[in-house]
């Protein structure tokens, strides 16, 4: 999921 990938990139 794109949303998850973006979130992971921002939070990690």
From Swiss-Prot:
PROSITE patterns, A to Z: BOMBESIN
Localization per Swiss-Prot or TrEMBL: Secreted
Annotated family: Belongs to the bombesin/neuromedin-B/ranatensin family.
Keyword Secreted: yes
InterPro entries noted in UniProt: Bombesin
Protein name, per record: [Asn3,Lys6,Phe13]3-14-bombesin
Residues recorded with modification Methionine amide: 12
Predominant subcellular localization, coarse grouping: secreted
Keywords from the named record: Amidation, Amphibian defense peptide, Secreted
């Amino acid at each position: 999921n794109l949303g998850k990938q973006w979130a992971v990139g921002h939070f990690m």
